[in-house]
Amino acid sequence: MSQTNTTDVTAYMQNVGKEARAASRALAAANTGDKNAALMAIHDVLKNAKQDILAANTVDMDNGQKNDLDAALLDRLELNDARFDGMLQGLKDVAALPDPIGEVTDMTYRPSGIHLGKMRVPLGVVGMIYESRPNVTLEAASLALKSGNAIILRGGSEAFESNQAIAKCILEGLKNVGMSEYSVQVLETTDRAAVGELITMTEYVDVIVPRGGKGLIERISRDARVPVIKHLDGNCHTFIDSDADPEIAINVSVNAKTHRYGTCNTMETLLVDEAIADELLPKIAEAIVEADNAMQLRLDDKAQAILNDNTILKGHLSAATAEDWDTEYLAPILAIKILSGIDEAIEHINTHGSHHTDVIITDNYTKSQRFIREVDSASVMINASSRFADGFEYGLGAEIGISTDKIHARGPVGLEGLTSQKWIVYGHGETRA
């Protein structure tokens, strides 16, 4: 399918929204078996279309390289055998998850005689705007279907062919089980005006989930009239406390930084307690550079004093600037700062971090508990890599995004994050006095 520009974007989007709203009402009433059948039907169609999808992705990758797409976006754009298999497994995982819809909690009797509680229900229609990552098309669709929501997906132009190939499979799977084809709509236009329409269609769309660069998220947050679930960036920290286990400190730091660069849960700043910096920082820095010889370390004055004469690190070191403490690199670059202790670490993270994911490496229980209480982030970890901040790793099956907001959903947003609760009341003819 080739890229198309809709001449009347407003009319096109109004129709998309209207169909999504109608589909959402049917989905809200669908039972768990029907939703799981749809997911597995999509799985089977997708599995048989592997070569077509990978071929479409090759077209996108070739275009991305010709258009000088940066390395982080190319990494997110690529679909290989392992990522394709992960997409298939993700569908199975979501199908296996408990269905939150219809769950009733907090039932209680009131003195008036009424019996009341809360029932979990879908949000309705989800609008998603994202860059690269064609696997997100499938993950978002599967979570929306399982949680009883219709979804409108607007991927980036760089992933157009991949997204349309996946959309074709989703549509066929839905048709195979008799579910509305408008339950999942992948926009067939690259016109940016479609985004402006989507984020202002309050009569049809209940929530917007943007995933992409900081500029995209800022624009959506500024212009949207529909509520937004978002995070701006992932400036994640690892703090090596004076009571850290050296082996854990080294292994976690290497994994958090070098496992993948193009992800929002990758460590961007390493903080080290000055009490152990002389002994431990060189070992950590050497291990990180050994893991990736392209690594560049940007150091504060104290870190420079410790590392500048290290021959192994020659060519990998430079002085940090004030901007480095606020930067999500998405690249083999790591900022390193030496601190006086946990007080300064917490202050630095809460000042410069993005409230995404932050880690402390320590064997001191008291300090670990203080860190998780006082660091203001969606995920706070003790002795584990920030790379675990992920819906799949958290047992959510998949995630539609990660939220650093504090209202409605925070952290990886899975099925429950795509629902709300309504009050239900049972009575026997009670009237209010």
From Swiss-Prot:
Keywords: Amino-acid biosynthesis, Cytoplasm, NADP, Oxidoreductase, Proline biosynthesis
Amino-acid biosynthesis keyword on record: yes
Enzyme Commission number(s) of this protein: 1.2.1.41
Gene Ontology CC terms: cytoplasm
Single Gene Ontology MF annotation: glutamate-5-semialdehyde dehydrogenase activity
Primary localization: cytoplasm
A single BP term in Gene Ontology: L-proline biosynthetic process
Top-rank taxon: Bacteria
Subcellular location: Cytoplasm
One Pfam family this sequence matches: Aldedh
Keyword check for NADP: yes
InterPro entries tied to this protein: Ald_DH/histidinol_DH (IPR016161), Ald_DH_C (IPR016163), Ald_DH_N (IPR016162), Aldehyde_DH_dom (IPR015590), Glu-5-SA_DH (IPR012134), GPR_dom (IPR000965)
Catalytic activity: L-glutamate 5-semialdehyde + phosphate + NADP(+) = L-glutamyl 5-phosphate + NADPH + H(+)
Pathway connected to this protein: Amino-acid biosynthesis; L-proline biosynthesis; L-glutamate 5-semialdehyde from L-glutamate: step 2/2
Function comment: Catalyzes the NADPH-dependent reduction of L-glutamate 5-phosphate into L-glutamate 5-semialdehyde and phosphate. The product spontaneously undergoes cyclization to form 1-pyrroline-5-carboxylate.
HAMAP family membership: ProA
Family the entry assigns: Belongs to the gamma-glutamyl phosphate reductase family.
Protein name: Gamma-glutamyl phosphate reductase
Organism expressing this protein natively: Psychrobacter cryohalolentis (strain ATCC BAA-1226 / DSM 17306 / VKM B-2378 / K5)
